[in-house]
A protein has these predicted regions:
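Residue-level signal for inorganic ion chemistry
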Residues: 33, 69, 116, 155, ...
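Phosphate/Mg2+-binding loops and adjacent switch elements
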Residues: 96-219, 229
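Conserved G1/Walker A P-loop phosphate-binding module
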Residues: 14-92, 103, 109
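Short, Lys/Arg-enriched N-terminal segments with co-localized hydrophobic residues
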Residues: 3-15
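Conserved small/polar residues in nucleotide/adenosyl-binding loops
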Residues: 235-238
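Short acidic, Gly/Ser-rich segments with clustered Asp/Glu that frequently serve as metal-coordination loops
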Residues: 91-92, 225-229
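Active-site flanking residues adjacent to catalytic metal/cofactor-binding acidic residues
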Residues: 86, 119, 222
Length: 238
């Protein structure tokens, strides 16, 4: 099966929906990207935290298989694949400790299936940068470190909660979970996201309830000048 799963019932053909969170530092173009994808018109302002509450838009995803399935099963209705995008408030250094709108931001991002991280790659003195200068590599590191620290807090809390119980009772499931969490904790302490650990499906299922952000797939969207797309190469050639 391709990227989207399909459920076929007697009277319905249902395409599964996915969600993505558009994230990044404040004022880097997240809302601009959201508007372009969803064709909405939310506020785009030249100051940090123009977005407070998350904006949500749903896009129907074209799929050529839909006509084939309609002809095969002749369903009474077809529910197409949709992709729900959420424009989330900007993240700043210290977000994992509640700086800016950090805690609120992180609670929203845990609910999505994938992360789209918008990174500014152009200079414009008329557009404010929260850190005073444009440095895409630094900006990516700021966000990724905060996501790692947020996951680390959750993993550490869980280890502290069931660690003693697992050592005392020797419960097989608890011991298995602790061993996996210790492995994840060690990686996070080395600034390694969970998605790079190569977890198998059983391991992912074991930690699924934690909604670890760094386990989610991530796409980097580089915001460049309209008339000079090659400016991104200054920051990505390495």
């Amino acid at each position: 099966m391709a990227f989207f799963d399909i459920i076929i019932r007697k009277k319905e053909v249902i395409y599964m929906s996915l969600t993505a969170g558009i994230v990044g530092l404040p004022n880097v173009g997240k809302s601009t990207l959201f508007n372009a994808i969803t064709k909405k018109s939310i506020l785009m302002a030249n100051y940090p935290f123009a977005t407070i509450d998350p904006n949500v838009g749903v896009v129907i995803v074209p799929d050529e298989r839909i006509d084939v399935l309609k002809n095969m099963y002749n369903p009474e209705r077809v529910i197409p694949t949709t992709y729900e995008f959420t424009d989330i408030a900007g993240l700043v250094k210290g977000a994992s400790n509640g700086e800016g709108l950090g805690n609120k931001f992180l609670s929203h991002i845990r609910e999505v299936d994938a992360v789209v991280e918008v990174v500014r790659c152009f200079d414009d003195e008329n557009i404010i940068h929260v850190d005073g200068s444009v440095d895409p590599i630094r900006d990516i590191e700021v966000i990724n470190v905060e996501l790692v620290l947020s996951d680390l807090e959750i993993v550490t809390s869980r280890i502290n909660r069931i660690g003693k119980k697992a050592m005392t009772t020797k419960n097989k499931d608890d011991v298995k979970e602790i061993e996996l969490l210790e492995r994840i904790k060690e990686a996070l302490e080395s600034n390694i996201p969970v998605r790079k650990l190569g977890l198998d499906e059983e391991e992912k299922k074991l930690i699924s309830s934690f909604n670890l952000i760094t386990l989610k797939p991530i796409i980097y969207a580089l915001n460049v000048e309209d008339n000079d797309i090659n400016t991104c190469l200054l920051y990505t050639s390495d």
